[in-house]
From Swiss-Prot:
Organism: Salinibacter ruber (strain DSM 13855 / M31)
Cofactor: pyridoxal 5'-phosphate
Annotated keywords: Cytoplasm, Isomerase, Porphyrin biosynthesis, Pyridoxal phosphate
InterPro entries hit by this protein: 4pyrrol_synth_GluAld_NH2Trfase, Aminotrans_3, Aminotrans_3_PPA_site, PyrdxlP-dep_Trfase, PyrdxlP-dep_Trfase_major, PyrdxlP-dep_Trfase_small
Name recorded for this polypeptide: Glutamate-1-semialdehyde 2,1-aminomutase
CDD domains: OAT_like (cd00610)
GO biological process: protoporphyrinogen IX biosynthetic process
EC number: 5.4.3.8
Molecular-function GO terms, alphabetical: glutamate-1-semialdehyde 2,1-aminomutase activity; pyridoxal phosphate binding; transaminase activity
Keyword Nucleotidyltransferase attributed: no
GO CC terms, sorted: cytoplasm
Length: 438
């Protein structure tokens, strides 16, 4: 199937993209934005409000990317805008402690079951890198287990793909990642507890932590199989391994306390990002006091940052988290209702067109996989027809709906998506699917 670029007037975006490639590698500051997976010209955005984006050519789109996850209440939420304006007038950074850091930390500790203490950083990547270092420092061990298809940022020991055999060491997935880093990273199959058990047994007393996306979001939205997270918890307890949940994507999205609240499995450490910053650059890692007290200056594990706990970002995060804390029952009931209606409507559209594709929805995130396989891990996700998805992406874009420009990224929505958006989405989706398969 040949994928044609969207028939949308993107002259200004195209001009910006060509200009950007002279000074920015690939013309973008994060690879997924380049539209390499779907083809065509990436959108250059001018403004956004609620569930809608406007690009540099004044085209408007209903947004299902949500800045890749942070916009649980939509773009330019008045509480966030006011908080950021007020703080900017007092200064954008001090390089010293502020009361707002304490208030945000208290909210995180109150909302997230595993978090007794929390350290603020500037990104999800910083959070996962710091958590892995902390787990190593706490246990005195070197190796970590991660899962194929789980993304934990661009830290060297996370950019590892599978080796040649089920129990081999990992190998670098990017130039610049050394074999020395790779040798301490073990790869397991997501949703395959027996594989994890074999890795632990083959590396007795050497594994510092198991890090997992409790709901995978970077190979499409893939929930954990029943018993998988519980099994990881039991395995870590039995072998004195630190269990780390990467909830950068799922934190505050699938429940007020994230996936750990939704599934009732409590990790030792949790990594957070996206929603916690209200759209500004914030990450965090937290967990048991006993482990967190190993972080400097209390303990020997070093981690620091000039802009960590930045007051501008903390004000934005506080606006979001305080709203979640005050209105969580209403908020998550609304999100669940939208998720259920969207999935049912999508399945109705698929049935009406005789298409046997797989849909996943968990809280305020989901995926439509262009495959009839039961998608439970990276291998089954990769059976999806990426050319068909690319054609679908452009068909939706032409009618004003912006989806992730990759089959293997989750869609996100928030409280800004209501009945009108649902109706528009499903009607447009029906036409787009029919067009792709005509």
């Amino acid at each position: 199937m040949e994928v044609a670029p969207s028939d949308v007037d993107l002259r200004t975006s195209r001009r910006f993209y060509e200009r950007a490639q002279h000074s920015i590698p690939g013309g973008v500051n994060s690879p997924a934005r380049a539209f390499d997976s779907v083809g065509g010209t990436p959108l250059f955005i001018e403004r956004a409000e609620g569930a809608y984006l406007e690009d540099a050519d004044a085209n408007e789109y209903l947004d299902y990317v949500g800045s890749w996850g942070p916009m649980i209440f939509g773009h330019a939420h008045p509480d966030v805008v006011e908080a950021v304006k007020d703080q900017a007038e007092a200064s954008t950074s001090f390089g010293a402690p502020t009361e707002i850091e304490i208030e945000v930390a208290d909210l995180v500790c109150d909302l997230v079951p595993s978090v007794e203490k929390v350290r603020m950083v500037n990104s999800g990547t910083e959070a996962t890198m710091s958590a892995a270092r902390l787990a190593r420092g706490y246990t005195g061990r070197d190796k970590i287990i991660k899962f194929e298809g789980n993304y934990h940022g661009h830290g060297d020991f996370f950019l590892i793909s599978a080796g040649s055999g089920a129990m081999t060491l990992g190998k670098p997935d990017s130039p610049g990642v050394t074999d020395g880093n790779a040798k301490d990273t073990l790869l397991a199959q997501y949703n395959d507890l027996s594989h994890v058990q074999r890795l632990v047994e083959a590396n007795q007393g050497e594994v510092a932590c198991i890090i997992v996306e409790p709901i995978a979001g970077n190979m499409g939205c893939i929930p954990p199989e029943p018993g998988f997270l519980e099994g990881l918890r039991e395995l870590c307890d039995a072998h004195d391994i630190v269990l780390v949940f990467d909830e950068v994507m799922t934190g505050f999205r699938v429940a007020p306390g994230g996936a750990q609240e939704r599934y009732g499995v409590i990790p030792d450490l949790t990594c957070l990002g996206k929603i916690i910053g209200g759209g500004l650059p914030v990450g965090a890692y937290g967990g048991k006091q006993e482990i967190m007290d190993y972080v400097a200056p209390t303990g020997p594990v070093y981690q620091a940052g000039t802009l960590s706990g930045n007051p501008l970002a903390m004000r934005a995060g506080h606006a979001i988290l305080s709203k979640i804390a005050e209105e969580k029952d209403r908020i998550y009931d609304q999100l669940e209702d939208y998720a259920e209606a969207l999935q049912k409507g999508t399945e109705h559209n698929l049935d009406a067109l005789g298409l046997d594709y797989t849909t996943h929805q968990v809280g305020a995130m989901g995926s439509l996989f262009f495959t009839d396989a039961e998608v439970v891990d990276q291998d089954t996700a990769q059976t999806a027809d990426t050319e068909a998805y690319a054609a679908y992406f452009h068909a939706m874009l032409e009618e004003g709906i912006y989806l992730p420009p990759s089959q293997f990224e989750a869609v996100f929505y928030g409280t800004c998506h209501g009945e009108d958006e649902l109706e528009t989405t499903l009607e447009t989706q029906r036409r787009a699917l029919k067009r792709v398969h005509s």
